[in-house]
Amino acid sequence: MSQSPYDGSPEGALVHQGFYNAWIEAAGEVVAEVARLSAQFPVYAVACVGHSLGAALAVHCTADLRQRGIEAVAYTYGQPRVGNDIFSAWYESVDPGSLRVTAYGDIVPHVPPQALDYRFQPTELFLNATGALVVCDASGEDPTCSNGVPVSELDQDAHTQGYFDVVFGACYLA
């Protein structure tokens, strides 16, 4: 899993190249539209929200907007790790209000692995095995939250069905 430098971040800050390339592909249109709407409706807050790959893109979106002077915050669900520890520390300083929601058993917050020099940014809110919402420690990798779920308990269903009774990626006919 290739990592690349993130524009505007400190020396040594690296991000997952695939997630970053996906953001760069969309950034021009997204940033232009958000800038237009922010100017038109200056009292409204900007929130970049996403699940799974969309969560990784929400992190990039928020960092990009904030570097351009647009106040934004990220709210993510089932987010994969986006960058290394230098990027994560920088991102926390850029977007201190971000919230990352994880669910017990969701496999996606375990990739890319820490062993490949990926780290989460705080703050994690963890839906534990009983469905209770736990505020995790400020490390981004709290062993009593998602990071502590045994590998044998990880599955795809928790990723698509484990968040507030919302089923992601499904369409239903009435």
Positions of predicted regions on the chain:
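A conserved cap/lid and substrate-binding interface adjacent to the catalytic center
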Residues: 1-49, 66-73, 95-96, 172-174
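Short, flexible coil/linker elements and helix-boundary hinge sites characteristic
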Residues: 5, 16, 41-42, 131, ...
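Generic hydrophobic, helix-prone segments enriched in Leu/Val/Ile
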Residues: 19, 38, 91, 145, ...
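Generic structural signal of hydrophobic/aromatic residues within well-ordered alpha-helices
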Residues: 26, 30, 34, 87, ...
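Gly/Ala-rich beta-loop-alpha elbow adjacent to hydrolase catalytic centers
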Residues: 50-54, 58
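Active-site signature of alpha/beta-hydrolase-fold catalytic machinery across serine-
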Residues: 60-64
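The feature captures the conserved acid-bearing segment of alpha/beta-hydrolase catalytic domains
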Residues: 67, 71-152
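C-terminal helix/juxtamembrane-tail motif
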Residues: 142-174
